[in-house]
């Protein structure tokens, strides 16, 4: 039985991928997540007998039970291309988010029994940040802590979900259990399109844009295009893939679809105007969950606003599962 801790847990996407790969051979013994709404979604789906810890900077390593695997999707905002690019200097609401990686390392190394594996996920821009120095610092810190790290950028669309989402994945093995070489998973070759993950009709009319709002979006796009900016909404082909879903501004509008199927006619839209004649709508939270590879039995218990943020911040579960299967092979061989 392998024991795991889930840091920066979000709604549990990384844990879910490892649970799927390891089956009954893994047990999560500690969870940390700062955001309270995310904690609620996590607790709904993982009914652990212990409380979720909050601010990781306040966690003492000695208070964390022994574990074999550390899962850490440390906040990507500090390294995001769309963000401020401040990296380790980023200070958000008084907390240096970029340095939270070092809290992961602190919890893993300030203990007698250090974990066998540290697994991290971050934005694809990490290797480019600060001319490569940010990633160099992360890898160097892992090496100094007696770990052998490997990293690779993988795209979610290569692992059975219709989302063009590139992320960097770092796998670091403790030296005494490290293989001579670690192979990241290859694309599975299964093509899925947006049409495959749509919810059954009828779709609530609240997801359909009003004609007034679409006109506003068009004017915004024209204004930004005239300035040479790339701002704007995007309508995705149902036979294609979505762009990377994100939690920031315009995240939903960059993945609009045309859905001519029946929709409920309840007048629930809060935007002035009538439902647009082109049947353009936002994707639903459940469809976003499917874009990330969450199974339909994964509960989405909160309001849409929270769910879009949580799913945009989460990970693509099938990618995590594929990497976790490779990690399990190494650990099983070293037993």
Where are the language model's segments positioned?
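C-terminal target-recognition/interaction regions appended to catalytic cores
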Residues: 213-335
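Class I S-adenosyl-L-methionine
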Residues: 59-69, 79-251
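Conserved beta-strand elements of the Class I
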Residues: 3-5, 68
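Conserved short alpha-helix immediately C-terminal to the canonical SAM/SAH-binding motif I
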Residues: 37-41, 78, 100
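Short glycine-/small-residue-rich Rossmann-like dinucleotide-binding loops
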Residues: 75
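SAM cofactor-binding core of SAM-dependent methyltransferases
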Residues: 5-58
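Short, contiguous clusters of charged residues that form electrostatic/catalytic patches at enzyme active sites
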Residues: 54, 99-106, 136, 289, ...
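Short, well-ordered alpha-helices that flank and scaffold nucleotide-derived cofactor binding pockets
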Residues: 16-20, 44, 106-110, 140, ...
């Amino acid at each position: 039985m392998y024991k795991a801790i889930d840091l920066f847990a979000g709604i549990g996407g990384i844990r879910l991928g490892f649970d799927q790969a390891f089956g009954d051979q893994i047990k999560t013994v500690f969870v940390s997540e700062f955001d309270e709404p995310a904690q609620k979604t996590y607790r709904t789906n993982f009914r652990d007998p212990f409380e979720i810890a909050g601010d990781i900077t306040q966690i003492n390593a000695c208070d964390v039970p022994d574990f074999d695997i550390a899962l850490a999707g440390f906040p990507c905002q500090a390294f995001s291309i769309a963000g401020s690019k401040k990296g380790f200097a980023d200070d958000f609401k008084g907390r240096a988010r970029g340095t939270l990686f070092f809290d992961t390392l602190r919890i893993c190394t300030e203990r007698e029994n250090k974990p066998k594996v540290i697994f991290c996920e971050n934005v694809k821009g990490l290797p480019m940040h600060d001319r490569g120095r940010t990633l160099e610092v992360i890898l160097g810190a892992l090496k100094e802590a007696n770990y052998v790290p490997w990293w690779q950028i993988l795209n979610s669309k290569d692992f059975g979900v219709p989302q063009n989402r590139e992320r960097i994945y770092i796998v670091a093995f403790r030296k005494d259990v490290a293989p001579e070489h670690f192979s990241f998973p290859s694309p599975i070759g299964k093509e899925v399109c947006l049409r495959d993950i749509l919810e059954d009709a009828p779709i609530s009319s609240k997801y359909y844009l009003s004609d007034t709002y679409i006109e506003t979006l068009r004017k915004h796009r024209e204004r930004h295009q005239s300035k040479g900016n790339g701002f704007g909404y995007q309508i995705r082909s149902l036979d294609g893939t979505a762009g990377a879903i994100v939690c920031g501004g315009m995240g939903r509008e960059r993945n609009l679809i045309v859905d001519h199927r029946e929709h409920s006619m309840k007048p629930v839209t809060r935007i002035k105007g009538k439902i647009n004649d082109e049947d353009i709508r936002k994707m639903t939270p459940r469809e976003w969950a499917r874009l990330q590879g969450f199974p339909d039995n994964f509960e989405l218990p909160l309001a849409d606003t929270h769910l879009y943020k949580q799913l945009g911040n989460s990970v693509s579960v099938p990618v995590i599962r594929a990497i976790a299967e490779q990690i399990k092979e190494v650990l099983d061989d070293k037993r």
